[in-house]
Curated annotation (Swiss-Prot):
It catalyses: 2'-deoxyribonucleotide-(2'-deoxyribose 5'-phosphate)-2'-deoxyribonucleotide-DNA = a 3'-end 2'-deoxyribonucleotide-(2,3-dehydro-2,3-deoxyribose 5'-phosphate)-DNA + a 5'-end 5'-phospho-2'-deoxyribonucleoside-DNA + H(+). PANTHER family: ENDONUCLEASE 8. Pfam families: Fapy_DNA_glyco, H2TH, zf-FPG_IleRS. A zinc finger (FPG-type) spans 229-263. This is Endonuclease 8. InterPro entries: DNA_glyclase/AP_lyase_DNA-bd (IPR015886), DNA_glyclase_Znf_dom_DNA_BS (IPR015887), EcNei-like_N (IPR044091), Endonuclease-VIII (IPR023713), FPG_cat (IPR012319), MutM-like_N-ter (IPR035937), Ribosomal_uS13-like_H2TH (IPR010979), Znf_DNA_glyclase/AP_lyase (IPR000214). Belongs to the FPG family. It comes from Klebsiella pneumoniae (strain 342). One of its GO terms (molecular function) is damaged DNA binding.
């Protein structure tokens, strides 16, 4: 599954295609969204935000299109007027004079006012997004130490979107390797310096993955263009301590780690 950095890069591509340009056409497959088609003509997409796997497409008139790709949804960028052949079912088309963005196969799509965005059940459940560049290390450390999260094992916590949105399995194992921690540790057990290192890595590693897009590397996953230290490297030597990287299952997902230097 693509994780936060890959979803943010997808949002960047959509923004590059249509952001700031007047919409010449808007089309929705779902009847409850069709009344908005004429209303959006002439409006502009001001920005596209991400919260975990949800995209929030903000329009100049104040409305926001909420979409969650779940397992099957996918966005495409095409030239204006282009109707690409696809076995997928088209759900959304937003077009300017130059480009169009198309959403296929997704079923979780809503048009929201600002107040509805603020009270949306999914958005209330998820934590701050690791690719939100206003999120600070201090805020992440405070979440780690909160009563809700301080006694949770990292193996599960780092997959819980209520803790931080945008993390997933490859980020989970790379973050824990970076700070030398086992997936069975908890924030309540850590020293202050360990907490600082973990809070920093929880932001730095997803952002490194995001910012290093475009660098060729065969050792990648869903476009995560930075070199993995442990993910999918079981049986290889750890570059830090020379131990052998192992694979197990934690929180129902494959977990890669080095027993020699992760404690």
């Amino acid at each position: 599954m693509p994780e936060g950095p890959e979803i943010r890069r997808a949002a960047d591509k959509l923004e590059a295609a249509i952001k700031g340009e007047p919409l010449t056409d808007a089309w929705f497959a779902f009847p409850q969204l069709q009344p908005y088609q004429s209303l959006l003509i002439g409006q502009r997409v001001t920005h596209i935000a991400t919260r975990g796997k949800a995209l929030l497409t903000h329009f100049s008139g104040g409305l926001t299109l909420y979409s969650h790709n779940q397992l099957y949804g996918v966005w495409r960028v095409v030239d204006a007027g282009e109707q690409p052949a696809s076995n997928r079912v088209l759900r959304v088309r937003l077009q300017t004079a130059r480009k169009a963005i198309l959403l296929y196969s997704a079923s979780d799509i809503e048009m929201l006012t600002a107040e509805q965005v603020a009270h949306h059940p999914f958005l209330l459940r998820v934590g701050p997004d690791v690719l939100d560049m206003t999120l600070t290390v201090e805020e992440v450390k405070a979440r780690l130490l909160s009563a809700k999260f301080r006694h949770r094992q990292f193996s599960g916590l780092l997959l819980d979107q209520a803790f931080l949105a945008g993390l997933g399995n490859y980020l989970r194992v790379e973050i824990l390797w970076q700070v030398g921690l086992s997936g069975k540790r908890k924030a309540a057990e850590l020293s202050d310096s360990q907490l600082d290192a973990l809070a920093h890595a929880l932001l730095a590693i997803p952002r490194l993955s995001y910012h290093t897009r475009g660098q060729a590397d065969d050792n990648k996953h869903h476009g995560a263009l930075f070199r993995f230290k442990v993910f999918h490297r079981d049986g290889e030597r750890c570059e830090r301590c020379g131990g052998v990287i192992e694979k197990t299952t934690l929180s129902s997902r494959p977990f890669y780690w080095c027993p020699g230097c992760q404690h």
